[in-house]
Amino acid sequence: MIQHPRIGIRPTIDGRRQGVRESLEVQTMNMAKSVADLISSTLKYPDGEPVECVISPSTIGRVPEAAASHELFKKSNVCATITVTPCWCYGSETMDMSPDIPHAIWGFNGTERPGAVYLAAVLASHAQKGIPAFGIYGRDVQEANDTDIPEDVKEKLLRYARAALATGLMRDTAYLSMGSVSMGIGGSIVNPDFFQEYLGMRNESVDMTEFTRRMDRGIYDPEEFERAMVWVKEHIKEGVDRNREDLILSKEEKEKQWEFVIKMFMIGRDLMVGNPRLAELGFEEEAVGHHALVAGFQGQRQWTDHFPNGDFMETFLNTQFDWNGIRKPFVFATENDSLNGVSMLFNYLLTNTPQIFADVRTYWSPEAVKRVTGHTLEGRAAAGFLHLINSGSCTLDGTGQATRDGKPVMKPFWELEESEVQAMLENTDFPPANREYFRGGGFSTRFLTKGDMPVTMVRLNLLKGVGPVLQIAEGYTLELPEDVHHTLDNRTDPGWPTTWFAPRLTGKGAFKSVYDVMNNWGANHGAITYGHIGADLITLASMLRIPVNMHNVPEEDIFRPKNWSLFGTEDLESADYRACQLLGPLHK
């Protein structure tokens, strides 16, 4: 069984015996325990289990104790460390020297002992040695016997832990390409050096003929298939067939296509993570899967010109339920766009929620909307908006039919109610695919995302000579008047899933206007997650050494390693680029 990645907590202490160290032992170890309790009681792994922490076997005052802690962490699958102290300690003697995992240090803000002095000293050592570390220092002075963690410190500890766990969860997993490059899309030209050096992941690839091989040879669970057919007939609404009359398939042909796309889902899932049932059926090799944390399916055009498309498979892999019940989602990219797949993966690992994959299709200005519909935009839509619409697939969680406190949300699977599953199904239909584009047929996914959800749109791009860069746009989904929605939606493909999105504007740079957001977006796709998580993404990017070229996160929420400030404090974007370039990828 593969261990969860853990956070290692390192209580460091003044090494002077005969009174000084002894007086600090309890307070120092209690700081470590309080941080571990905070993380374990607040954060969860993608499977819903509480995040695990490992505390050093003793306080760390000298190098042998630092070495003992390091050995314990190596055996315990520790993916990041947090050093805590209320006092002065010996900086380079007590620091963790691991260069390939993130580090953070919390220096207690008190007057009796100089925790802040140690924090500054050890961060200077980290900078000198080229091992980045995040500095955490409470805004307000605390009493020496105060065991509470201040709110500002909690926020930084949790932001750091979420991002650090994401690095650990990615390491030693795989991106699985099902097929190759789709229609010349740059993101589906998979770059193995990026995955290996920045994420610690490997790349695997199967030809799309693996789907037909498994279908023809019965390499899937036949009992599950029969159960799935019953569930689909009961719960899935086939939508309006908008094809030309000569392209409309017969009822019998559509029945065969439903069988086909259900098998595609089962095979796609089994390729990613394996299925012990296959071993029972005599297919031991196929049963192990590819250990894929994220995958993509090429589809267009070689597959879709002949076979039913991947929309149903992609939709339900990215959704948190199927005929087997509620479960955690997979991360699965349309058109094998690996860079959007990674963008989805970042979002997923930070939130434990499913991801919307969408084309960043159209910028609608207030003037254009007025001309086409006669409607004057107002509220969050007043400056215009973006039409996010994928060519036929999207997680059903993207409907926004789940709720929290009466508001639409996308939530982790362990919070999802059966009634919310039913609401998602009732508000979605699956029209036959547009056969002018998808000659082999299939079934698209059609819904409208509910408005007023805080969301973050993300995209990772590769820039020759620089490497990966990340862009982030926080904003809100919109609910347009029904007639306005239909008028605009019908101008594209009304058989596809639509999300209306208004980014939050700042009045400067790429966020001067909604048009500027669209104009500066780096690719045709975006990954959309529930919540405003831009600050967490910036922290994660700094750990991986990926510069952020565009974001609308308030400056006070940006949390990067302390040595980033040594690259400059006025132009943070430039400092970020130079820090990432100098330090290089996390796993190189």
Swiss-Prot record:
It is found in: Cytoplasm. GO terms for biological process: D-arabinose catabolic process; L-fucose catabolic process. It is an enzyme of class 5 (isomerase). InterPro entries: Fuc/Ara_isomerase_C (IPR004216), Fuc_iso_dom3_sf (IPR038393), Fuc_isomerase_C (IPR015888), Fucose_iso_dom1_sf (IPR038391), Fucose_iso_N1 (IPR012888), Fucose_isomerase (IPR005763), Fucose_isomerase_dom2_sf (IPR038392), Fucose_isomerase_N/cen_sf (IPR009015). Pfam families: Fucose_iso_C, Fucose_iso_N1, Fucose_iso_N2. Mn(2+) binds at residues 335, 359, 525. Pathway: Carbohydrate degradation; L-fucose degradation; L-lactaldehyde and glycerone phosphate from L-fucose: step 1/3. Its cofactor is Mn(2+). The keyword Cytoplasm applies. GO terms for cellular component: cytoplasm. One of its GO terms (molecular function) is L-fucose isomerase activity. It comes from the Bacteria. Its main location: cytoplasm. It catalyses: L-fucose = L-fuculose. Converts the aldose L-fucose into the corresponding ketose L-fuculose. Belongs to the L-fucose isomerase family. This is L-fucose isomerase. It comes from Streptococcus pneumoniae (strain 70585).
